[in-house]
Amino acid sequence: MEVLKVASDSNPNSVAGALAGVIRECGGTAEMQAIGAGAINQAIKAVAIARGFVAPGGLDLICIPAFTDIMIDGEERTAIRIIVEPR
């Protein structure tokens, strides 16, 4: 599964397009990763926008948030992992 990394300066419309594309092409689940309040805000906005993108095709999306530990520059950080899948 491809992980979409979202930053606080990510454009939510662009992330939503990528998210909708992954869901349509892979026929199921996408995963996003965000660190920090700004990045999480952009990721959640992207889910809301992506719901509008896939709705005409008869899909609705749900997201499942979870914590995950990742390594950045040799340092362990806690990120939010958001699994997005059709309902």
Please provide the spans of the model-predicted regions.
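Conserved mixed alpha/beta catalytic, RNA-binding, or beta-rich assembly cores of soluble enzyme
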Residues: 1-29, 43, 47, 51, ...
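Short, hydrophobic/π-rich interface segment
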Residues: 37-63
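C-terminal edge-of-domain segments
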Residues: 55-87
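Short beta->alpha linker loops
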Residues: 10, 35-38
